[in-house]
Amino acid sequence: MLKARKVHFIGVGGYGMSALAMVLKQRGTAVSGSDVAASARTQRLAEAGVEVHIGAHDAAHIEGADVVVYSTQVPEDNPELAAARARGLRVLHRSELLAEFLNGRSIAVAGTHGKTTTSSMVACLLEKAGLDPTILLGGDLEVIGGTGKAGRGDWVVAEADESDRSFLRYHPRVAVVTNVEPEHLEFWEGSFARIQEGFRQFLRQVQPGGLAALCADDPTLRSIGQELRNQPGVVHVVFYGTHPEAEWRAENIRPWEKGIVYDCVRDGRLLGEVRLPIPGRHNALNSLGALVAGDYAGLSFRQMQETLLSFGNARRRFEVWADVDGIRVVDDYAHHPTEIRATLAAAREQAGRRVVAVFQPQRYSRTHWLMDEFATAFQDADVLVLTRIYSPPGERPIPGVSAEALARRIQANTGRPVAVISDQEEILRFLLAEVRPGDTVITMGAGDIWKVARALAQALQSRAVTRTASSGSGRPAPGSGR
């Protein structure tokens, strides 16, 4: 495990970075960090005793540190990173530090979609069972009050990110892989075949005798799983899903008032009913992956069944902001076409509801590579608003790639008009004029589009309070004769 007097994190407000910073702090290491903007995560770190610098990066921020941690988003000319290298300090990529946690008794959740929800489920299963795991997530989880927690138990639960090849540093005891699709192609030479090979290599790195829990509904994972099974003694492969080859199956998936319910079948034997307080067929698959991992860790099905019944998902995963006057306001991190389809389908499951969607595309490169898939991802949206493309610093626009171009492609496919609105206040005005009782309004994207959901929820609640007050003041006073 890392030995250091003080560790400094550049970009400490990121989900993965804040998780690592919190765990080190809770384990007694002196920690500092910097970020250009304050957030709930930087505030939590400061309250925990982390020395947090907000604003422009400055070499002075690394004073006293003997280890400096950075992420892929940090450019080489960052003054703190440059100073650390110049001073000969130990400099670690985020994934190198995470690898020190994941190369022991660990459960790593990988996949193009569903990592945060699935790893959150695994974390909750082990936490509620009293195993006190160390937890490192890519989203805020209510049960631990953030993204990271240093446990006293042997198990570590974490996300294994494929986006920048980070997961190739890890050697977990258990790997849960949800799916494999084209995404983050800029890190994989634009090749889906290279992404597939990356997942193949990651699974080969599971500790000997460990477990690979793979979603059988994904053809790439079925193929890789069969390859691994043909290499006896390397890793134990278990398939889960709805596919006939799955040992752990979700059957009879159906909605219930709070989310979804399904029959959990293992090796042809009914274990029982699993009820999730979150909607979506994809979440049935996510929970199955978590059940397989929990079973490996020694948990009983009954224990896991009870924990999932009260599961509170990570923030920005079908997060309900308000339900006012029959209008439900939801926010979701969905930013890939497959995630968008699954999220809109989950919203559509609520019978009789019109779906009003607001999508913030992220990255010109993603929009360019997946334009055809995005064009067909919004069939379940009755009303659709697109914002400008949300792009990280340093990414250059690509000619012909814009929200307007995407809107034209979607409109040609659905036959329904698509509004393109850049300003969030203007989006709010549009929604307030458009929505009606019975609607589900859902904001989607990896950027700051959640602020629209928050603003809409506040506006609807304020409108309801004002209307109630007005109707109350209009009642006749006792004895007025009206």
Curated annotation (Swiss-Prot):
ATP binds at residues 111-117. One of its GO terms (molecular function) is UDP-N-acetylmuramate-L-alanine ligase activity. It is found in: Cytoplasm. It catalyses: UDP-N-acetyl-alpha-D-muramate + L-alanine + ATP = UDP-N-acetyl-alpha-D-muramoyl-L-alanine + ADP + phosphate + H(+). Keywords: ATP-binding, Cell cycle, Cell division, Cell shape, Cell wall biogenesis/degradation, Cytoplasm, Ligase, Nucleotide-binding, Peptidoglycan synthesis. One of its GO terms (cellular component) is cytoplasm. Pathway: Cell wall biogenesis; peptidoglycan biosynthesis. GO terms for biological process: cell division; cell wall organization; peptidoglycan biosynthetic process; regulation of cell shape. Pfam families: Mur_ligase (PF01225), Mur_ligase_C (PF02875), Mur_ligase_M (PF08245). Its EC number is 6.3.2.8. Cell wall formation. Belongs to the MurCDEF family. This is UDP-N-acetylmuramate--L-alanine ligase. The gene is murC.
